Amino acid sequence: MDSVDTGFSAGEEQWRARLGTLREVVRQDLVSRQLAAHLPDLPPRRVLDVGCGQGTQALRLARRGHQVTGVDASTRLLDDFRAAMAAEPAEVGDRVRLVQGDAGQLTDLFAASSFDVVLCQGVLMYFPDPGPLLDAIGHLLAPGGIASVLVRNGDALAMRPGLLGDWDEAEKAFGEDSYRNRIGVHARADRRADLTAALARREMDVREWYGVRVFTDTVASSTELPDEETLQAILRAEERAGRTDPYRQVAALLHLIAVRREETPTRRTPEQPPS
């Protein structure tokens, strides 16, 4: 894969400023819970977090005992990751390896089938052509391994502007496959059926899918966390909606859990008896 300018860097500082706000906490917590349903603590797995950023998901998995490799192109975000890791117990940090690199060069950085889990969460939308990145994920994922892919929901792009009363933008969003996100970056959305088919072509079969941010997507980006009791009520409602139709279908984000097909032994043709 060639190096790719994803455009995320233009919104990086806004992204960093919004960490810890309600919308981001809901996203991170839901994704973590949804993945945990498919990833037991034992045995420890080899995890690759593509576009690991500040390390929220990677550190949660390292705390659970998994060996995690985080790769990101951003020096600033990797510094944030290291600062967060320094506050963890030593054994957690020992399970983490950080690599500064481009998500477009994964196959140059890592060997084939070298990970049991690959996270690609909030990354695919910044690739105008997602195919090469999906190719790389399939290449790096061991047979039976899990891919966790979080994308903007292309089937519901009109929901956010519509709920905010921006009727012109809501009308434009129907049939679109791109949008301008909250950090000011023009990004791409994925339709669930299309992404499911794209993963299947790369021998990764979707086992389950979830919605993320059904109820809280339209809150202001700067909205701080409420008291703990209210936060837990929000998370319970969001978690239930994220696994229940029709609510999950109109979530802002889609979280797909796919499993890499096991290698099938080559069948030998029986020898013909001598004539």
Model feature map: region roles:
Residues 117-129:
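A short SAM/SAH-binding and catalytic strip from SAM-dependent methyltransferases
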Residues 56-106:
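Class I SAM-dependent methyltransferase SAM/SAH-binding core
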